[in-house]
Curated annotation (Swiss-Prot):
Family per similarity comment: Belongs to the class-II aminoacyl-tRNA synthetase family. Phe-tRNA synthetase alpha subunit type 1 subfamily.
Catalytic activity: tRNA(Phe) + L-phenylalanine + ATP = L-phenylalanyl-tRNA(Phe) + AMP + diphosphate + H(+)
Cofactor remark: Binds 2 magnesium ions per tetramer.
Gene3D superfamilies the UniProt entry points to: Bira Bifunctional Protein, Domain 2
Positions bound to Mg(2+): 256
Cofactor(s) of this protein: Mg(2+)
Signal peptide: none
Keywords: Aminoacyl-tRNA synthetase, ATP-binding, Cytoplasm, Ligase, Magnesium, Metal-binding, Nucleotide-binding, Protein biosynthesis
Protein name, as recorded: Phenylalanine--tRNA ligase alpha subunit
Length: 341
């Protein structure tokens, strides 16, 4: 028997053996017997080196073709074995569709999501629309169009997550303010909830990822009195009780004048704690009248249109409502904590 005939004989034997495999373990054994490192077909291939150049070409090509055919046949056989096993198990198993399910705990909304929906309801009842925007933003939308100077500290890499293409993870939902000013014709009232990112040192009151709701009203003769009234309505409906607040001057490039609305810390009731950094007060709501440069950048005449804007931190709002002393709980995924809400 020459080498070519020997290859044909081995191939036929392999087809018979592999095809008669009764399990995946049996299949693996039969495969190794023929095309494994010490298999019969592999042993023949080792003798090809002893042949003439012409025979090497012919026998080598034939051996490789048969080896590939056997590899494919092994795959087909394995698939067939799996199918037969499934059919056998399916035929022997019985599923009672009327059987009562075991008790399973129901899921629930995250406390931040709950308060977001609640705030959305409050503002939509006052005629506000809800807007959305991408979490990956351009430098222009996040900074430039909001009147941030090129050398503003917030643009630096220690405060902002920049991407390789020059875009960034938005640092505030104010970026949606820019998109809205371009998209809508005034007058309008909008809120824009979303997740924001800052390169923060994480502690009890700071996270690198947190949630805000941006609010903006644009119309004619909008004043600080309209802003303060809107904030008072919001806080009274959120906390359902009298909340001690203070309004102090604050600087934000996109508003003029700018204010900081602080509330008396509800975690320590104003006595001082890590959440309020022992001050008894917590910065909750930076706000102000929209800067004329922001309106001009969007193509609006600041002599004709005015407005106010605010940014509300949802994480801190939830902390105040429930007396939570550490903002890191929200991102922890701890079900013992989350199931309380």
């Amino acid at each position: 028997m020459n080498l070519s005939e020997e290859l044909d004989s081995i191939y036929q034997e392999a087809i018979q053996k592999i095809g008669s495999s009764i399990s995946e373990e049996d299949l693996d054994k039969n495969k190794n017997d023929f095309i494994g490192k010490k298999g019969k077909l592999t042993a023949v291939l080792k003798n090809v080196a002893l042949l003439s150049i012409e025979e090497k070409k012919t026998i080598g090509q034939k051996a490789n073709e048969l080896s590939k055919k056997l590899e494919n046949f092994v795959v087909e056989t394995k698939s067939s074995l799996k199918k037969k096993l499934f059919e056998t198990q399916a035929a022997s198993e019985f599923f009672d569709s009327l059987r009562p399910l075991p008790n399973a705990s129901n899921g629930s909304l995250h406390p931040i999501t709950q308060i977001q929906y609640e705030i959305e309801d409050i503002f939509t009842s006052m005629g506000f629309s809800i807007m959305d925007g991408p979490e990956i933003e351009t430098d222009t939308n996040n900074f430039g169009a909001l009147n941030f100077t090129d050398d503003h500290p917030a643009r630096e890499m220690q405060d902002t997550f920049y991407l390789e293409n020059g875009n960034l993870l938005r640092t505030h939902t104010s970026a949606i303010q820019v998109r809205t000013l371009r998209k809508l014709k005034p007058p309008f009232r909008i809120i824009a909830p979303g997740r924001v990112f800052r390169y923060e040192e994480v502690d009890a009151s700071h996270e690198h990822t947190f949630y805000q709701i941006e609010g903006m009203v644009v119309g004619k003769d909008i004043s600080a009195a309209n802003l303060i009234d809107t904030m008072q309505v919001l806080l009274s409906r959120i906390f359902e009780k009298e909340i001690k607040t203070r309004l102090r001057p604050g600087y934000f490039p996109f508003v003029e004048p700018g204010f900081e609305l602080d509330i008396n810390c509800l975690v320590c009731e104003g006595k001082g704690c890590p959440v309020c950094k022992q001050s008894g007060w917590l910065e909750l709501l930076p706000c102000g009248l929209i800067h004329p440069n922001v309106l001009s950048h969007a193509g609006l005449d600041p002599k004709e249109w005015t407005g106010f804007a605010f940014g509300l931190g949802l994480d801190r709002l939830v902390m105040m409502r429930y007396g939570i002393h550490d903002i890191r709980y929200f991102q922890s995924g701890n079900l013992r904590f989350l199931k309380q809400f």
